[in-house]
A protein has these predicted regions:
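Extracellular glycan-targeting catalytic surfaces
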Residues: 1-219
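Long, repeat-rich segments with strong aromatic
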Residues: 231-233
């Protein structure tokens, strides 16, 4: 039988307050009932459309040659108008290059996490397992699938064509991972998510943390004195 899963004791969360999450999915907070209905409607569409996301579906081959490598370009870097091949890219301070979102994995990453959250909240509110099941599929396809799973590094994040294959500043692309952590904890309430898959996701993030703490790009970003350093923390 389908029933709301908010009666289950929520696990400790990283960003959100579990009691507040419970109040939201129960509809206890005035003015949020329509928002919750919209989230459930979005979850229905996500399940129906069956769209999954992966770094491997990007037409742009990263410098590593491995489609599973996350790739993005710096937001303020543009093709060089003075060279035939556009290289090296030149910086236009404060001018966002829309080409970035056409060649980068960043939009797919954000879309995946947005969908996972919608499905997770809808699952918490209704107990409808297909929501949790498709959220798990999104997570598996992005992180764990043998052919499509992202490698646990950001070697090629915010690359600058013709100058560098990746920078520490690109780590901020994955700041949204913080949002994903709470969704993963909430999905642990689903009986459809196997322990082996849960462990595999944790192993992936252990490897990612190891890269962050030891790779020169990670070390550089950790030492940053601006919003990038804060995002790293």
């Amino acid at each position: 039988d389908v029933g709301p899963s908010w009666h289950v004791t929520l696990p400790p969360l990283v960003v959100l307050n579990p009691s507040q999450v419970s109040r939201v999915v129960r509809g206890d907070i005035q003015g949020l009932s329509l928002l919750l209905e919209a989230v459930i409607d979005k979850a229905e569409k996500i399940v129906a459309q069956k769209t999954v996301y992966s770094v491997a579906t990007n037409d742009k081959v990263p410098p590593s040659g491995d489609l599973r490598s996350y790739y993005s370009t710096g937001p303020y870097w543009w093709r060089n108008p003075e060279t035939s091949d556009g290289l090296p890219y030149v910086r236009r301070d404060g001018e966002f290059n829309p080409e970035r979102d056409l060649v980068s994995d960043r939009p797919a990453l954000h879309a995946m996490i947005s969908d996972v959250w919608a499905l997770t909240i809808a699952y918490q509110a209704t107990g409808f397992e297909p929501y949790a099941l498709f959220a798990q599929r999104l997570i598996h396809f992005w992180f764990l699938d043998e052919s499509s799973g992202m490698l646990p590094d950001l070697n090629h994040a915010q690359a600058i064509p013709g100058i560098t294959e990746g920078r520490g500043t690109g780590i901020i692309d994955t700041l949204v991972f913080v949002e994903l952590v709470d969704a993963l904890r909430l999905l642990e309430n689903s009986y459809t998510w196997s322990l082996s898959e849960q462990v595999a996701v944790k192993v992936w993030f252990d490897k990612f943390l190891n890269w962050l703490s030891k790779h020169p790009n990670g070390i550089d970003e950790r030492m940053a004195k601006n919003n990038h350093g804060t995002a790293y923390d």
